[in-house]
Amino acid sequence: MNATDTGMQADPTDLIQRIASLTRMLRDSMRELGLDQAIKDAAEAIPDARDRLRYVAQMTEQAANRVLNATEAAGPIQDGMARGAQALDERWQQWYDQPLELPQARALVQDTRAFLAAVPQHTQQTQAKLMEIVMAQDFQDLTGQVIMRMMDVVGAIERELLQVLLDNVPQERRDEANSLLNGPQVNPGGKADVVTSQDQVDDLLASLGF
């Protein structure tokens, strides 16, 4: 954009001040992100946003591996119980259909009692694996805070950059785009003067000639 071509006299000092303010805001936000007390113990060694994203990816991968390992360990336990129960059920059905000799009946009863005696142990093993799956989800508390804070930072930067653009474009373009400045909102509540999607952000930039 050329101030001479548009008839506007841009104020370089004001633009520089805005950029400086944006830089300070970014640095302050990143500093706050690094020192946030809720995640300090787990993430205080991560110095910048790139490392934070790597941290989120690592935590997610670790949780996925824990879930997969627990599932793979619990599967054979459940399969074994299912096969044992099915085999006993078939043997009992055969006895009902045709009475067994005493030694065979005694063996069936003993096998059934042995199966039932092993059920609590198998149940405890399965419960332990289920608890491991539940505990693997604890990463969401930490990574969720990191992601939400970074989203807030990105949203604030986007709004500030859009405001800088609006303040330095011709008046006719500013009037067209100004109603979209209020920024992306998850729940616009029926308002027509807010940006509700990334497409509208793109439309706003297009209306400004970018």
Swiss-Prot record:
A Pfam short name: CheZ
In terms of InterPro entries, this protein maps to: Chemotax_Pase_CheZ (IPR007439), CheZ_family_phosphatases (IPR050992)
State if Hydrolase is listed as a keyword: yes
- Give the EC number(s) listed in the UniProt record: 3.1.3.-
What SUPFAM superfamilies would the database entry show?
Chemotaxis phosphatase CheZ
Q: What is one Gene Ontology biological process annotated in the Swiss-Prot or TrEMBL record?
A: archaeal or bacterial-type flagellum-dependent cell motility
* Signal peptide positions (record): none
Provide this UniProt record's keywords sorted from A to Z.
Chemotaxis, Cytoplasm, Flagellar rotation, Hydrolase, Protein phosphatase
Molecular function via GO: phosphoprotein phosphatase activity
Query: Per the record, GO CC terms?
Result: bacterial-type flagellum; cytoplasm
Question: Where is it predominantly found?
Answer: cytoplasm
Q: Where in the cell is it found?
A: Cytoplasm
Segments spanning the bilayer are none
List the residues marked with site Enhances dephosphorylation of CheY-P. 145
Spell out the subunit comment.
Homodimer.
To which protein family does this belong? Belongs to the CheZ family.
Function, please? Plays an important role in bacterial chemotaxis signal transduction pathway by accelerating the dephosphorylation of phosphorylated CheY (CheY-P).
Q: NCBIfam families this protein is in? A: PRK11166.1
What is the recorded name of this protein?
Protein phosphatase CheZ
Gene that encodes it: cheZ
